[in-house]
Amino acid sequence: MNPYSAGPVQLLGADDPLARSVPFIWANSPSPYGPVALGIAAVISIITNDSIVAAVILHRITSLLGVVAAGWAITALAKRCRFHPATALWLGILNPLTILHLIGGIHNESLMLGFVLVGMELVLRGIDKLEASTSLSMSTAWPGWLLTFLGGTLISAAGMVKVTGFIGLGFAGMALARFLFRRTSMKQWLSISAAAGYFLSVLILSIGAFTLASGIGLGWVTGQGGAATIRSWLSVSTDVGVASGFMGMMLGLGDHTEAILSVTRAAGVLAAAAFMVRMLFATFRGVMHPIGGLGVSTLILVILFPVVHPWYILWAIFPLAAWANRWFFRYAVVIYSAVMSFVVLPRGLGLPPGTIAQIYLSAALGLGTLMIIGWVALRLMRGRVLN
């Protein structure tokens, strides 16, 4: 079965219980995930067979392990950036979006973020060891090179969960390039080329190894973009395209929304890519910490991405939690997370406004009733004690 050839309904049939458990918006979409994510899912499927309950439990345990790994990395990276680890964990790991969506919703971001953050920490530790080594030869500096290789492999694994994980390789590469430029007599372009070649080799080896181990082809490379068929109101580029299309219809020019969306979304991705290049060179110059560059670049990417779900912001919050110490960032994270926790369900779908109002009204009435009962009971108890 090729998960990149068709959606769950086409592959399993509309009557299959597993296919029916997939939300409608994804039921006909081929998988956009890489061999690491699908390989883990395949192992869970072999263990649980067709038991949905057992599979959900194992997938949730896997997500929890990814979040735990990310928590370890955030703690280490926060210490590296001279930031309070407790605050970083509070902003990232204890974020309600993390609990509701990464663990509750079992989204693959838990694995991706765990891999990429642990990988970044290992790469930076490897560079620290290389700086302390008297020589860069493999015979004397092998611990440092081993850590950078393992870190690059984990970041590559993150990209083979979701392709956005590959962004970490760029900032890991620039951190290594900066070290090579300062330590050796290499020119800037040569040190950048050497670091890029090193991590490109790690990437190719990792893709080959995971592809052979999982038996899953390279369909994930060309299968990206299926989610772009969804119009997400959190996407700035999509909002601009939809608003422009609506204005065109109001002016009697016809419905050209789809054509406009292709332009605005492409412009958004290009703008995010240009900003990312700027952050990469800022990292090379030492103006930006690699983790800060990764977090800020990912934040801009999420804002301008064609499709944005509420938990996508965690791509940026996790690395920024270990680096950003401005009060504005903390308050922005708290406000966004609090609002989005009440808007979208863990499975990624929203409820009708009437249903949401009914739920919150019922909760308010229930809480008010309990408070009144508690207040009356407290008054009665006080009266008896006084008597």
What are these regions (language model features)?
Residues 99-103, 137-172, 296-303:
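Membrane-interface alpha helices of multi-pass inner-membrane proteins
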